[in-house]
Each structure stands twice: as structure tokens, then as C-alpha cells.
Regions:
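Long amphipathic alpha-helix in the N-terminal Rossmann-like dinucleotide-binding domain
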Residues: 51-58, 114-118
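An N-terminal boundary/leader segment
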Residues: 1-55
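Generic hydrophobic alpha-helical segments
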Residues: 13-17, 60, 154
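Conserved SET/PR domain catalytic loop and adjacent active-site segment
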Residues: 21, 68-69, 89
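Immediate post-signal peptide segment of exported/extracytoplasmic ligand-binding proteins
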Residues: 60-77
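Short glycine/serine-rich loop/turn segments
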Residues: 74-160
Length: 160
């Protein structure tokens, strides 16, 4: 399967979806495979759910078919650092104290991305409360190293 995220820029992906040169499910499948491939070696993701991803892309496609309104991030997935609240996934802040906590709301920045067509792909690993302590995330280019602390999951998830 071709990695669409390496072939197209964000504006090109959006345009291809809106012209129907690409299908929303193509992006969903690329995302799911990318997360799976990265996760095997890096432990970059706290949580991501294949069914939620497919459902979000299906909803985005249905909405586009209904109203056809262009959005700057239509169908573009994004990972969320696990210190930002999301409706779909727990916000644990890298801490066992907050394990399983689901806030029931999105942080404003998440609402803004979703309002503009973005799709939540899941939550990426962070150090406890996003400070100092190392975690289990590994550098995808050298698994004997870590990408750091606070944004380690985000860094490992996008490294190529």
C-alpha cells in the first residue's frame, strides 16, 4: 500500500478528496497502516482505535457528500499529545493517576482542528505531566535511544 502522507502535501490531499481522486477510506487505511507500522518499534501512541478512525472518516465523507463545503483540513488526520483533552480518547497526561480519565470535551485547539475538517487519529505518548521523566517511546531511527520526554510520542509518530 502506497503511503499517501509521503506522496501528497496536506493541500494536495484535501484537493484530491474534494475532487474525488482519492477516497476518504484511502486516507483512513493509510493512517491505520502507518500507525501500526510505527507502533511496532516505537511505542509512540497511547491509544488509537481502528474502528473510531474508520467511523470518523466515514462521517467526514458523508458530511462532504451532503453539503460539499470545502474545509482547509478536510480528511486530514492528526495525533494529539496526551495532555490535550479529546472526547474520543482518554486524557491520561502520561500519569497512572489519570489512567482511563475521559474528560468528555475537546480542548479548544482540538475543536478548532476538527471544525476545519481535521480527524483525531489518537493520542501520542508524553512524559508524566509533559515534563522530564523518560517514557517507553523509542527513536524509530535508533531503538537504543529515546526521542526525549514531553513530545516523544509525537516525534516518533512522524519521524521518517
Amino acid at each position: 500500500m502506497e503511503n499517501l502522507f509521503l506522496k501528497y502535501s496536506i493541500p494536495e490531499l484535501v484537493k484530491s478528496l474534494e475532487k474525488r481522486d482519492l477516497l476518504f477510506i484511502d486516507i483512513a487505511n493509510t493512517l491505520i497502516k502507518t500507525i501500526s507500522d510505527v507502533e511496532k518499534n516505537t511505542h509512540a501512541w497511547v491509544c488509537s482505535d481502528t474502528d473510531k478512525i474508520k467511523n470518523s472518516f466515514l462521517q467526514a465523507e458523508n458530511e462532504f457528500n451532503r453539503n460539499g463545503v470545502s474545509q482547509p483540513l478536510r480528511g486530514i488526520p492528526f495525533g494529539v499529545k496526551d495532555i490535550f483533552n479529546t472526547k474520543e480518547y482518554p486524557t491520561q497526561m502520561g500519569s497512572p493517576t489519570w489512567e482511563g480519565f475521559t474528560p468528555g470535551n475537546n480542548a479548544r485547539v482540538i475543536d478548532s482542528l476538527v471544525f476545519n475538517g481535521g480527524i483525531v487519529a489518537g493520542k501520542t505518548v508524553t512524559a508524566e505531566f509533559a515534563v522530564h521523566a523518560l517514557n517507553e517511546t523509542l527513536n524509530p531511527h535508533d531503538v537504543t535511544r529515546t526521542p526525549g520526554t514531553s513530545s516523544s510520542g509525537s516525534a516518533a509518530a512522524v519521524a521518517r
